[in-house]
Amino acid sequence: MKSNYDVIVVGGGHAGVEAALASARLNKKTALINLYEDKIATMPCNPSVGGPAKGIVVREIDALGGEMAKAADATALQTKLLNSSRGPGVWALRVQSDKEEYSKYMRNVIKNQKNLDLITRACTGLVYDENKTVTGIYLDDQTILNAKAVIITTGTYLKSEILKGVDRYESGPNNEKTTKGISQSLIDLGIKLMRFKTGTPARVYRDSVDLSNAVLEPGTDMKLAFSFSTSTYTPIEKQQPCYLIHSTLETKKIIEDNLEKSAMYSGTVKSIGPRYCPSFEDKAVRFREKDTHQIFIEPETLNGDTWYVQGFSTSMPIEVQEMMLKSLPGFENVRVKHWAYAIEYDCIDPMQLSPSLELKDVKNLFTAGQINGTSGYEEAAGQGLIAGINASRKIDGLDPIILRRDEAYIGVMIDDLINKGVWEPYRLLTSRAEHRLLLRNDNAETRLKQYGKEIGLISDQEWNQYLIYVKEIEQAIKELKEIRFTPKSQLAINLKNKNQADLSHGYSGYEIIKIPTVDINELIEFIPSLQKLKTNQLQSIVIEIRFEGYVKKERQLVDKLVKLERKKIPLDINYSKVDNLATEAKDKLEKIRPLNIGQASRITGVNPADIQMLLFYLKKQYPLENIDN
């Protein structure tokens, strides 16, 4: 076994895979440490990728040169465009994944990646010196692996415990081994740890439930994909269905009668769970006025015999779980393959991180994924990609890649984590992004592909394809502006017959697209440049035209905010000497140590008056430094 690496990644989940691939593809000798070879990028909870905000993150990962989008497209059982009836700022793609094929896909990519070794051992601790500089890791066979940077991506395995009712025992997800030694290393390095909780529902045998009365939830009949490079699509007739059912009054009564047996409500659980993915008993308590709740029945893999009971996670003991399941419509004769459970695990306070995802007080140590207090495969993968990129760039002596809030949901997430911290598992939501009209599902490439190219993760071939992609959009918009349609044109007749528009006079194609009721597909046969475009290109054209004024105002606002990002704060500043700065602001600024005024202004507890005092101090104390660059 080699003992010297540039980058070591500990944990082969969604964050670890992206971190390791990014590092290796940037020509760094990389080791990925994972307990099991066949447990790479597994889906221990929901068998899906994407969703509101999350789906846009997957497209951002792809634009930067990551792998998740390709894997999701290649292993999709169903593809669905969410929120299509609402504004474009919240449109998102979601795929139902074949979890076995997804893991197999990523495993093959890892094994075939140049510069990357997969080591199936446990990491038992970190190697570091008296200056808090991490230099490697310990393995469970006492081997020391040396590295210039270490990335911890342990997910929910860090000192984890499974909870069912009053039963509690050490275990990772699905009764796999837990990881304990790393927590002690982090504590010894002075890193503050927290304890979070999540959970997963039961998996039930398909042939034991009757879904004949359930509501069918099909995919979307459009050519949709996460990855820019995907060119083949699963037709709607070959996509696997999902189903919707509702819990019953009997389900509610069972929970009320047995609430004290739940790990959540018996006092067994001391940690904090996810607000946006609560256990079913938590829903029953928090929303007592509701008699029923939605439950989605989803396939996990074509090779399996189970349904995933989405929305029905619980920490109840097995005998109560069985009663709960049998109270659901069509589940009267249900047989269970895997019971639901809750899991507690260690994570760090992410306010200890710099924007690069390196620990501020520990050199060469990066963290990504659920160890940073987030939830979700997509959030983890986005962080892993950034950590892998920045660990590699640090080795090369390059500045880190820091995405702004107006550039990517990944930027929103990392900015939230390091400036606001977390008190519960963090989930990305469209509402967290103040510039969501700019951070759309359709424009991830135009926002981030340039970064991917400059970083070195986008090939020349893909870059050239992207340039053609952009040129095609520009050409189509140009043609829409030039071509005109009279009230007697065939297009005008078609639009009137379909109640989409009544063209009372001559209109350009551009003006017609501005009409909210017009479907751009009606123009395709009349405008040659539209005929070869992908779905995302057509969506971009419609949004850029129809929301032109809003997008322009949003970009003008962003230009003003970016100026604050350019006002740098010296690393040696002493905040205690800043006059008239509120005590809370001093404490927060000292703890987080923002890199610029823009970041400082987003810290909870730092108000506009504090920012004015800080700017005044900087101009007075650092007159020779150009804080505007």
From Swiss-Prot:
Pfam families, per database record: GIDA, GIDA_C_1st, SAM_GIDA_C
GO biological process: tRNA methylation; tRNA wobble uridine modification
Similarity annotation: Belongs to the MnmG family.
Binding site for FAD: 11-16
Described purpose of this protein according to its UniProt entry: NAD-binding protein involved in the addition of a carboxymethylaminomethyl (cmnm) group at the wobble position (U34) of certain tRNAs, forming tRNA-cmnm(5)s(2)U34.
GO cellular component, one term: cytosol
HAMAP family in the record: MnmG_GidA
Cofactor: FAD
Name of the protein: tRNA uridine 5-carboxymethylaminomethyl modification enzyme MnmG
Residues at which NAD(+) binds: 273-287
The species this protein was found in: Mycoplasma mycoides subsp. mycoides SC (strain CCUG 32753 / NCTC 10114 / PG1)
Subunit architecture: Homodimer. Heterotetramer of two MnmE and two MnmG subunits.
Molecular function, one GO term: flavin adenine dinucleotide binding
Keywords: Cytoplasm, FAD, Flavoprotein, NAD, tRNA processing
Keyword Manganese annotated: no
Source superkingdom: Bacteria
Span of the signal peptide: none
Compartment(s): Cytoplasm
Gene: mnmG1
UniProt entry tagged with the keyword NAD: yes
